[in-house]
């Protein structure tokens, strides 16, 4: 799948994972107080769904068989990284991200944040659907709505 992306943005996948109680997986970035959905970049020539499953496993230890895809955003959702932190985010190569969102239902398995030597998250919580848009870092708030 080839997606047309605005210049200066990195293609990214974000996963909204629902548990059996229809609560959403919300993760705290390691060494910060920032919370977000699992997300990550799409490698060059990588299929968007393949990237989503790779990032889901890398970040929260879930496999393809642990989830069911319920919906996928039709459009890319963009957010800008503030200029004062761009050099620290994504190596300063991008002005923001173009995200494709996946709504996933957890059907088996458990979240595992300690799946690699340098995990991106150090804590997670299952939260009501309205919670993330108020708690995410300011520059992502519009994308979460």
Regions found by a protein language model. Give the residues of each.
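Unchanged
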Residues: 42-138
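Acidic, metal-coordinating catalytic segment for phosphate/diphosphate chemistry
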Residues: 1-20, 91-92
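A short acidic/small-residue loop/turn micro-motif
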Residues: 32-33
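Short connector loops at helix/strand junctions that flank enzyme active sites
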Residues: 10, 37, 95-99
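Active-site beta-strand termini and strand-to-loop segments that position acidic
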Residues: 17-20, 29, 104-106
